[in-house]
Amino acid sequence: KQLAYNRVMREFRTWKYYKGGMADDIWVYNPEKKSVENITNNEAQDIFPMWIGDEIYFLSDRDYTMNLFVYNTKTKQTSKVTNFTEYDVKFPSSFGNTIVFENGGYIYKMDAASKKPEKVNVTLASDNVYARSEIKDGSKYITSASLSPKGERMVVTARGEVFNIPVDKGVTKNITRTPGAHERDAQWSPDGKHIAYISDATGETELYLQDSEGGEPTQLTKNNDTYIRTFQWSPDSKKIVYTDRKNRINLLDVSNKQLTTISQSLLGEARNVSFSPDNNWLTYSRVSDNNFSIVYVYDIAGKKEYPVTDKWYESYSPVFSTDGKYLVFTSARDFNPTYSQTEWNHVYNNMGGVYLALLSKDTASPFMETDAEVAIESTPAKADASKKDETKNEASTPVVKIDIEGITDRIVKLPLPGSNYYDLYSDGTNVYYFTKGGMKMFDLKKQKEETVSDAAMMVDPAGKKAVFFKDDQLFVTDIPKGKADLSKPVNLANMKITVDYTKEWAQIFDEAWRAFRDGFYLENMHGKDWKAIKEKYAALLPYVKTRLDLNYIIGEMIGELGVGHAYVNPGEVESPKRVSMGLLGAEVSRDKSGFFRLE
């Protein structure tokens, strides 16, 4: 005769202790009286009403942990029924006078008369088919690729493993084989001797080094206290620069493992950190005090930072040209207002452009018109054979000269339309960038743009070869001067990964916990003991048998922080193959009465 219900159901949200406008109450509707009564009227969550006799049972977290409560429709009194303190009571259901619910991975039943929950011993015979180890095709999980200096081989990371793969012919090698660790962002050293990568095998992200011929890895960093974002080799292979979640720029000497923090910002992370071709400078972009991104160069020997752009415009993604003449970057300086059709205002879109900073005051702009000169013939001096090798070495490593004074006045724009530009690279003659329509190249001499590919491009350390990723395939070519030939993909057929789901799920759980530890907007984690919360939910990991189980546990863990928009990506969830079936249908027509008729 009456109905107890919730107006809103948000129990699937990974947000505990919620007391906002979506926190629900239990409502009772009387059809005869056409009345509605709020029987909880509490700022906490009151959900899952179950009507048994004169009592309405429901879940509530008014006492912090979600427990069963009961409301007596005669006395109008509410009392607490269960007193669990470690895990929430979840998803109750009633049948007759019995209520069943889940708590901490166990099923309980409770008689409404006794109000005493009893644990139900459940034994399930299962093959655990979704938890069995299996071999997967690693080419479907590629996250990064890096070419060897001459482009004969590449290192590819896929599903937390590092592969050493031949570009043409040879043997594919999984050089890590760690199903319980997440390896990523492997890069070949410019001298070709080593492969560096990031791994969380110790429980924290650390940098590792491995001989390109194989062998045991060497741990370069130790006792790291936060997430390593990205890293880059120096051109001489002697140093590595990397950034982390504490907004630090760290310089690592590879031979002695000496670590120097050269910069730390309270405003934000440094992005796109890279070396100059002579190893003496770094460049990066970072947010300034007005929240606009500025491009900087850093003198490694002098230990001093210099701004290249001013703070009136957003500037980012800097990279040195390989000849050492230019600093190439993108900046939002194109003001092309579009008048709104719905309001009395302008909007600004496609403000980005590609810019060159002329590092030396002696470097002429590539767009400066030149005057014709008369060529004068002269007899070339005889070359000194003893100095050939010395000259060759000097030519191969350009000296980067940066005149800081007046550098903001030596910035020129490539004649390109306003857009978004990414993945910059330049050899001093051509500038490459990814934008709408794919990878493009601008020839500074011809002052002409060419389309290279619809796939993004990465260049080898020697600046001779390029790798493209398209349609789950990798392609290696000479650095193109026009349209790239992507007709021959690299053979990835032997990228086989042995997936141990039990170890992989434990790693995912741990990385999810660290992601919140390192990235949460408050260091005090809303006053919660984040380590204790990890231990609380890690106790359930041995019982995880599917990815959905893992997602549920991670969701419960991050829900303890009591914050919105903290979601769990479902990841690789198995689903059964279903037989497609037809569905019943009906022909519908409108009747003269105003109703619809089923024909």
Placement of each model-derived feature along the sequence:
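Blade-terminus and WD-like Trp-Asp/Gly-His loop motifs, strongest in beta-propeller folds
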Residues: K1-L3, F48-E55, F91-N97, A145-E152, ...
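A flexible loop/linker signature enriched in serine peptidases of the S9 family
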Residues: K1-W27, P31-I47, Y57-F69, T75, ...
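Short beta-alpha junctions and helix-cap segments that line functional grooves
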Residues: R13-K16, F91-G96, G105-Y106, E269-N272, ...
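Beta-strand initiation motifs
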Residues: K33-E37, T75-S79, S114-E118, K169-K173, ...
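Conserved blade-ending motifs and adjacent loop-strand segments that build the rim/top face
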Residues: S79-S93, Y306-S317, P415-Y422, E450-V459
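A short helix->beta-strand "capping" segment at the edge of beta-propeller domains
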Residues: S126-I142, V400-P417
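Beta-strand-rich domains and repeat architectures in extracellular enzymes and scaffolds
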Residues: Y141-G160, P415-K436
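Flexible, low-complexity junctional segments that flank or bridge functional domains
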Residues: P217-K222, S237, G438-E599
